[in-house]
Amino acid sequence: MMRQSLQAVLPEISGNKTSSLRKSVCSDLLTLFNSPHSALPSLLVSGMPEWQVHNPSDKHLQSWYCRQLRSALLFHEPRIAALQVNLKEAYCHTLAISLEIMLYHDDEPLTFDLVWDNGGWRSATLENVS
């Protein structure tokens, strides 16, 4: 119900503003992932030691991780209309995810890739977002 009211309040986006909207969403997501007091569950953003304890090749665990991350991101980012989370890499010390995002008032999908690197998340695609 809250998402519906937020959607109604969001202004229509013109072509020129679409690029800045896409960059803003990606920047805000990266900030959310790297915040020391992130609203996302710790395993989803900074819990890599916890990830390494589990079997990273476990498909059930990977599916659970993607579902949990998708749910949390949809809750915290009202500009996202649809989201698909995919693991690109899930090895003992490497975790790379790809977010396939559809934004409200934007007909083109947005792909945002993140990689866990040296204790934090970095964007593999933020420079290329347009």
Swiss-Prot record:
One of its GO terms (biological process) is negative regulation of protein catabolic process. It comes from Escherichia coli (strain K12). NCBIfam families: PRK14128.1-1, PRK14128.1-3. This is Anti-adapter protein IraD. Its main location: cytoplasm. One of its GO terms (cellular component) is cytoplasm. Belongs to the GpW/Gp25 family. IraD subfamily. InterPro entries: Anti-adapt_IraD, IraD/Gp25-like. HAMAP family: IraD (MF_02010). Induction: By oxidative stress. Low expression in exponential phase, rises in stationary phase, translation is repressed by CsrA via translational coupling to the upstream open reading frame IdlP (at protein level). Inhibits RpoS proteolysis by regulating RssB activity, thereby increasing the stability of the sigma stress factor RpoS during oxidative stress. Its effect on RpoS stability is due to its interaction with RssB, which probably blocks the interaction of RssB with RpoS, and the consequent delivery of the RssB-RpoS complex to the ClpXP protein degradation pathway. Interacts with RssB. Keywords: Cytoplasm, Stress response. One of its GO terms (molecular function) is anti-sigma factor antagonist activity. It is found in: Cytoplasm.
